[in-house]
């Protein structure tokens, strides 16, 4: 599946809103912190 990384707000629930928690055969929303997001960008 293709991972779509969603940057979570600094404060708030650690889970994605229901409207964004869409799982299909090709898409998977992965909530990450901003630091984790930039680390993944560096590895890519």
UniProtKB/Swiss-Prot annotation:
Coiled coil (UniProt feature): none
Subcellular localization, as worded in the UniProt entry: Nucleus, Nuclear pore complex; Cytoplasm
UniProt KW keywords: Cytoplasm, mRNA transport, Nuclear pore complex, Nucleus, Protein transport, Translocation, Transport
Principal location: nucleus
GO CC term, one of those recorded: cytosol
GO biological process, one term: mRNA transport
Functional summary from the UniProt entry: Functions as a component of the nuclear pore complex (NPC). Involved in poly(A)+ RNA transport.
Subunit record text: Part of the nuclear pore complex (NPC). Forms part of the NUP160 subcomplex in the nuclear pore which is composed of nup160, nup133, nup107, Nup96 and sec13p. Nup85 may also be present. This complex plays a role in RNA export and in tethering Nup98 and nup153 to the nucleus.
Name assigned to this protein: Nuclear pore complex protein Nup160
